[in-house]
Amino acid sequence: MTALVSVMNKHAVVIAADSAITVTTPYGHKVINSANKVFALSKYHPVGIMFCGNANFMSTPIEVIVKLYRKQLKDRCFATISEYLSDFLGFIKNNHYFCSAEMQNANMENEIENFYTLILKIAANTANEKKSLFLKEFILQLNSIVVNSCENCTSFQNFLEKDFVQSIKGHCAKIIAKHEDVFGDNAPLKRLFIKAFAKFVAHGNSNFANETQIVVVGYGDKEIFPSLRSVCLYWGFYEFFRYNSYISAGITEDNSASICRLGQTDIINTFINGINDNLKKALYDIFGNFTSQLKNLMINNVDTQYSKDIINSAIDEGKLVDTLGATLDNIIRDTSIAPWM
């Protein structure tokens, strides 16, 4: 379990995190249960930072990056929390992601290999392991990514695909050479693979294994109420830094309070709402089944079709479940959430 929570109102902001982090090593993933994930981003101003997910970014611990940033920030401040986050991201990029060129190259080749494995599995499952259909499905999957019009991730809004393709060509060639049984001498397929990977990288909804959620929260120098900005960090490759905006929240004249949950939110939801999400869903299912059975029982125990039609139209299982949900949400809001605010 790894989770973050922020509670803000017009008076203050409170942030908290559990102590579990995931550390990625060349040999796999390791979970550490005694880590600190909440830090002051500035020694002089009310700005904090917390994270969840992978504890390392490009092999460097997030905690180390935060301490280095805080040291160089000194007593400087920014007008808004958004500017603090932008400066922090710029600090990471300007320091070459705190890793060598060799590490960046190796990480990119690992991402290309993961992409190949993803497409391979989808194609194999779709083709039902029939070799005659596999290559066709492999090409179809690559083409579907190329033609997908999904919005780009935050850092690739002005993405120049041809520049990225040029920078990864050599790395893609290494991965393609490892899988000669699939690519062979098929030059168009090789070009399609490279283009599809570039599109996959740019798409905002693409998933990568080593994700770190960063949350910056507090008061900008020109902000009288607290605000929160968060991004998901993935990787850096020379001038290409992949990250995506996640949750944004702020207190305003019209919005007097906010609760933000990140990471594995099921435990936090249980704590805040007073009921587990799965239990809530089970309650709706049980109530829906009960009303359906009751309706059928009543219909089966009347003689005339007119009476059956009246019962059938009077008892709407869907509306009853919706009414239960609305009632329960009101109770949760009044008894569990409102006291926090």
What are these model-predicted stretches?
Residues 1-341:
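N-terminal nucleophile
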